[in-house]
């Protein structure tokens, strides 16, 4: 597990590097599906002092199997996503400013241009509000459930992120690095959408044919963007 712990540590350290977190407001995890184990950031440990061996290993029930700290308080959300979506290898949660602003507004991040379409096939959805019972019950698990409910039958790697109503963004990917990459992009397109809507409040979404072209040239069966 040491290699995966290093990957998760590096991915967590990318959060302050890319300006996605303040203090300890964020966490990254990754899964070893063969072993059924997840590596995740410890709860409340400052990035400035965090080390590789501080990463916590949990099983799919959230039981700690390795590590001296408690795992992230959002662990149950991460586990719910891994259990529902076999294609996910990494999950990240932040409170990055612009993506969180859309979450607090209770609005999806609209697909307005090609930067968005290069990564997200359509709007980045916003979940419904959790009920008082859901919050007072198994809050973090119910957060995972409302994400799953909102995504429905969408392929999660085609919509690799979401904003949870009045909470903040979650993103995911093939591995921890990919999840952080998508979280960075989500914050950037959230900022772009906010600026663009300020310039032109009547702005229309990106045309479907342009969105399809940009997404499929990177992610479709005949993708040709980048190097093989």
From Swiss-Prot:
Q: Where does Zn(2+) bind?
A: 74, 93, 95, 167
Reaction catalyzed: L-ribulose 5-phosphate = D-xylulose 5-phosphate
Give the matching Gene3D superfamilies.
Class II aldolase/adducin N-terminal domain
Family annotation (InterPro entries): Aldolase_class_II_sugar_metab, Aldolase_II/adducin_N, Aldolase_II/adducin_N_sf, UlaF
Q: List the disulfide bonds.
A: none
What EC numbers are recorded for this enzyme?
A: 5.1.3.4
Q: Which GO terms describe its molecular function?
A: aldehyde-lyase activity; L-ribulose-phosphate 4-epimerase activity; zinc ion binding
The active site is formed by: 118 (proton donor/acceptor), 225 (proton donor/acceptor)
The answer to whether UniProt assigns keyword Transmembrane to this entry is: no
- Please give the function described in this protein's UniProt entry: Catalyzes the isomerization of L-ribulose 5-phosphate to D-xylulose 5-phosphate. Is involved in the anaerobic L-ascorbate utilization.
Q: What PANTHER family does the record tag this protein with?
A: FUCULOSE PHOSPHATE ALDOLASE, L-RIBULOSE-5-PHOSPHATE 4-EPIMERASE ULAF
The record's similarity note reads: Belongs to the aldolase class II family. AraD/FucA subfamily.
Protein name according to UniProt: L-ribulose-5-phosphate 4-epimerase UlaF
This chain's source organism reads: Salmonella agona (strain SL483)
